[in-house]
């Protein structure tokens, strides 16, 4: 891990791209054009009002057997944030002992990434299960443009982002086209895409089908979002409360409660935490990796408890990818385009294993259905044998040089001729084609939450 400490300064340079200080003197981007044509009326009269105290229960509260009675409309103060650890975890000092020989860490072996294409998706009648709504939380992997009106540099509402999206116009998605959640929503028969909750052009019909609260630059750690002035996970859960109140005004309290309880909650985050907070803070050199991962896992459990209190019952947790294979990481940590960074992949593997344990515990909760989506393996297969997936380039992105550009540094850059042959769109995010490949595996994983 010594090399990680040496390159921490380089990662800080990348994090600077997402710093709100880079926005001094800049004009806020205009709201993106609508990504589809809708016949529903705009959401007039549905303000974003803060939830009253007590509406968002403590993470320690038991799951309610029935929805709580609606609060009076006159109560509008700011909600208490979900419980956070009071102070960073500190491991106890070990007893003095003779130094042990160096421990050899064995990275994941490539044979576990079988080159065989994924099996066909499991056939489930999702319409019969009442799957009509999707609610999304997380980072840039599932942000459809919530950051567009924030004072942050973590935006993608400019070309070449979105050049292959519906209508061929940028919306704020960090891809050339649709995200995993957009494609998943279409496969579930919900909608062709999932809009951002903070999109000023959001329509009432879209509200019923679901929204994304995700924000590029966010993570499970609140400090991660502060670094880029993104919407923290706490803010996203507050937006869930506002969404629910708006939904009640549209369809009534009982119908709104039923929609939320049957909704698919998709959560995709963690990569930003591990990259732009964990490494840039130089914590890797101090050996505090497991402690930091444990803090993230504790927060995930707390956030999920709050979402369940607000009505969530079906949860899809998308794991982190092999982050050592991201073109950006290959460049900054010096492995180049020939190989992935093994230690970074070990971090991702360790985090995913702990997230799986959270999902297993959630399954033991009454009325809760949860599943983990292993995108690490899917991306690993495509990395070692891209031809089986119709890809030709897996080590660099389509935008610019493909080895460093992300967000603002991708603005206006030339792109590759055939993005559908590339795994990565920029140096950290996938093309729509790769998102389609990943979504096929997602469909294989989520059937259990609908039976």
Residue map of PLM features:
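Conserved active-site regions of diverse hydrolases
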Residues: 2-45, 53-55, 73, 86-88, ...
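Conserved positions within tandem-repeat grammars
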Residues: 65-66, 77, 91, 97-99
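Intrinsically disordered, low-complexity, repeat-rich polar/charged segments
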Residues: 53-65, 72-75, 83
């Amino acid at each position: 891990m010594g090399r990680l400490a040496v390159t921490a300064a380089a990662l800080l340079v990348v994090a600077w791209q997402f710093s709100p200080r880079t926005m001094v003197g800049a004009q806020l981007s205009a709201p993106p054009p609508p990504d589809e044509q809708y016949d529903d009326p705009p959401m007039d009269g549905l303000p974003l009002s803060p939830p009253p105290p007590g509406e968002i229960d403590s993470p320690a509260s038991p799951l309610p057997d029935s929805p709580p009675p609606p609060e009076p409309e006159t109560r509008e103060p700011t909600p208490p944030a979900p419980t956070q650890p009071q102070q960073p975890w500190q491991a106890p000092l070990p007893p003095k002992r003779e130094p042990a020989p160096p421990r050899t860490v064995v990275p994941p072996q490539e044979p576990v990434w079988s080159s065989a294409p994924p099996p066909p998706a499991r056939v489930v009648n999702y319409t019969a299960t009442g799957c009509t709504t999707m609610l999304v939380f997380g980072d840039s992997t599932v942000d459809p443009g919530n950051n567009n009106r924030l004072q942050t540099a973590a935006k993608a509402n400019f070309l070449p982002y979105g050049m292959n999206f519906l209508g061929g116009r940028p919306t704020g998605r960090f891809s050339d086209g649709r995200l995993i959640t957009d494609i998943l929503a279409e496969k579930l028969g919900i909608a062709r895409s999932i809009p951002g909750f903070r999109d000023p052009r959001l329509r009432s019909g879209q509200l019923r089908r679901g929204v994304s609260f995700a924000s590029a630059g966010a993570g499970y750690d609140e400090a991660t979002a502060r670094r880029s002035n993104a919407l923290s996970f706490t803010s996203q859960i507050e937006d869930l409360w506002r969404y629910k109140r708006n939904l009640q005004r549209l369809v009534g309290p009982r119908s709104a409660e039923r929609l939320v309880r049957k909704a698919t909650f998709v959560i995709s985050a963690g990569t930003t935490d591990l990259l732009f907070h964990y490494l840039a803070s130089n914590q890797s050199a101090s050996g505090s990796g497991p402690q930091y991962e444990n803090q993230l896992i504790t927060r995930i459990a707390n956030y999920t408890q709050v979402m369940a209190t607000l009505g969530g019952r079906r949860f899809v947790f998308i794991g982190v990818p092999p982050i050592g294979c991201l073109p950006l990481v290959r460049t900054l940590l010096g492995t180049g385009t020939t190989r992935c960074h093994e230690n970074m992949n070990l971090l991702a593997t360790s985090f995913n294993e702990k997230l799986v344990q959270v999902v297993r515990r959630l399954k033991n909760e009454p009325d809760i259905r949860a599943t983990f989506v292993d995108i690490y393996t899917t991306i690993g297969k495509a990395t070692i044998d891209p031809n089986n997936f119709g890809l030709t380039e897996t080590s660099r992105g389509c935008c610019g040089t493909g080895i460093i550009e992300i967000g603002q540094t991708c603005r206006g850059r030339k792109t590759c001729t055939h993005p559908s042959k590339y795994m990565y769109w920029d140096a950290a995010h996938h093309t729509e084609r790769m998102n389609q490949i990943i979504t096929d595996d997602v469909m294989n994983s989520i059937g259990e939450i609908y039976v």
